[in-house]
Amino acid sequence: MFQESNRIEFKVELNDKLEKEVVAFLNNKEGGILYIGVDDNGKPIGVSDVDSMQLKIADRIKNNILPSTLGLFDIVTEEIENISVIKILISSGLEKPYYIKKHGMSPNGCFTRMGTSSQPMSTAMIDSLYSKRTHNTLRNITSPRQDLTFAQLKIYYQERGLELNESLQIR
């Protein structure tokens, strides 16, 4: 068949390492493919109850990984040598670093692909990826109403029984 690489991972069965592998591919610059029901040599072993397993996989990925992975993965059934296996296609995420929810944004929760394995990220790598995220802060959001003034803001607060002092703090 084919072999494991920095973009392909095989698992004989669904196990507790699913989230780790998915996180590593999300954090990889090219994403990757995870096969369930294939041994380390690329030989198809198969999975029983494909539909149920696909639902479990989707549920675990959606609920156990942050930030949201919606739209970043697809789960399909593939026939290899007339044996049904599950193929999980994972895109490179846009909001890196992705991490396992229960471990947080730490070396225990953030992984990346190195060769044919998923390795924990260093704290420096996590910090670097996080700092590259662009967050919309109030300072970066452009108001659709550019004609507003502080006088109007004072009136707005007065109508609600609040008051702004000279340093624009609410009293």
What residues fall within each predicted segment?
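Conserved N-terminal catalytic/coupling substructures associated with nucleotide/phosphate chemistry
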Residues: 1-171
